[in-house]
Amino acid sequence: MSLEPTQTVSGTPPMLHQRTHKQVYPLRMETIPILESDSKATLQSNEPTQKDEEETEYFENKQSVSNLSPDLKFKRHKNKHIQGFPTLGERLDNLQDIKKAKRVENFNSSAPIADDNHSGDATANATANATANATANVNASAMPAPYMPYYYYYHPMNAPTPAMIPYPGSPMHSIMPNSSLQPFYSQPTAAGGPDMTTPQNISSSQQLLPAPQLFPYGSFHQQQLQQPHYIQRTRERKKSIGSQRGRRLSMLASQANGGSTIISPHKDIPEEDFYTVVGNASFGKNLQIRQLFNWCLMRSLHKLELKAKNQEEEGELEHLTKKSKLESTKAETDYVDPKRLAMVIIKEFVDDLKKDHIAIDWEDEEKYEDEDEEKILDNTENYDDTELRQLFQENDDDDDDDDEVDYSEIQRSRRKFSERRKALPKEPKKLLPNSKNVENTKNLSILTSKVNAIKNEVKEWAVTLDTSRPDLEWQELTSFSSQPLEPLSDTEEPDLAIADVETKLETKVDELRYQSHILNSHSLALNEITNSKVNKLNIETMRKISSETDDDHSQVINPQQLLKGLSLSFSKKLDL
């Protein structure tokens, strides 16, 4: 459904009257019908009685909505403003309309409305445009509805520009909700600018309103448009602070002209967390290694100083208990503790290293082994050892002789050092055995002992089996069984007789078990031999039969003859 409004223009000056059409109230449905506007005299007054009269005239002059669609019904409610602000219930209704927006077919939200600063000639143009739009709508009603995705309530738009801020003449200024159901509004023409109501400029002047807001007030919306500038600036500032972490330490440490120094972190930060506060990586890995090395040295020096201080305090207390104060002062003036001298030397070394007075290449790595050191020393062109060069310079104050360095002394000293180191006897490296290897050796010794015991037992059984004569044992058993039993003498004690009977019975049972075992083993062996022979005979007979028979004249096999042949072969084998 497309509803186009008619434009009304009066001859009043633009400064006196700001509103250009009749007051429009929000609807519960998805469309806002815009009809012919009344005179500006009725719009100027804000009394309730005049508004009631306007509503009666509006409903009398309005075309019946039932002619458009029998199911479409507009539910209108009054919006009586008190001092230009809507009530709480109206604002809740507007918010509900925004949240419960629905898809509307054939909905045209464009409604070009003319401005106040046009002359009487513009009236004729407006009426002509209205008639043309009416005829176009009649023709367009017969055409099919354009396809619009259900999730598009308004076309995509770019960021809101200052020209899209609601001007006082628009009905959405502090009255209408910023919803997706609002029509297009033309921009007010600037003084001396082109006429935006001409047919050539009407399409270009129509712009979408900004995205819907929860607050319908224009002043709050203007504040929101200005707010992201400050938010963006604070976000950029936070990003710069996070990315420049440790940059100040790196800049102080990388300053030239003798001003570079290493600043230690806070004492509450442990040594394990030094990597978290290391300098910025943009200054290179060299500076990071230098900072970590110096921080560890400074922290260890601080611990040594505290330890030495505690020892001195304990020594002073013990010394005061033994001697008087005068003697202690004399001893202090005469004697110098070597530990203090060592602490002073270490402190000076740490200070020089902290202030970068000692030239060290922190990224240098040993790329060669001891065998290739002599080859490196021969190549004097690439040799550059700053510490040794400073030690072997003849004139430290002469700047002209800095480039001319005698490498012969350096080479000679390095050769002597390498020869001396090679002459020292190298102790063999002690390697710890692997726990798995130790466990495997123990298991191997246990298993070998078990295997040897089993082998010895097998040998003993073989000897006993070779020496035994089962036939003689059977003869002895038969002779014993045939002999009559001798009566026991009364003189023998019954206990000794029972013991002898038990021992004899055990020996006989053992012999019987042994003989039964031998018979069983012989029977199993004979069975296996016969089975193997039968299988071989079957294979041979089948092979002969297959070779003798032809495809055309196949002979019938007689099973009786086969059985006879098998029986004869078995009888021959048994006779043998």
Curated annotation (Swiss-Prot):
Residue(s) carrying Phosphoserine: S250
Compositionally biased spans, kind Basic and acidic residues: 420-430
Primary subcellular site in the record, as a coarse category: nucleus
Annotated keywords: Cell cycle, Cell division, Centromere, Chromosome, Kinetochore, Mitosis, Nucleus, Phosphoprotein
InterPro entries registered for this protein in UniProt: Dsn1/Mis13, EF_Hand_1_Ca_BS
Residue ranges with Basic residues bias: 235-246
Gene Ontology CC: kinetochore; MIS12/MIND type complex; nucleus; outer kinetochore; spindle pole
Cell compartment(s), UniProt: Nucleus; Chromosome, Centromere, Kinetochore
GO biological process: attachment of spindle microtubules to kinetochore; cell division; chromosome segregation; meiotic sister chromatid cohesion, centromeric; spindle attachment to meiosis I kinetochore
Segments of skewed composition (Polar residues): 1-11
Disordered: region residues: 1-22, 35-64, 185-205, 227-246, 412-437
Subunit structure: Component of the MIND kinetochore complex, which is composed of at least MTW1, NNF1, NSL1 and DSN1. Interacts with NSL1.
Name the UniProt record assigns to this protein: Kinetochore-associated protein DSN1
Organism: Saccharomyces cerevisiae (strain ATCC 204508 / S288c)
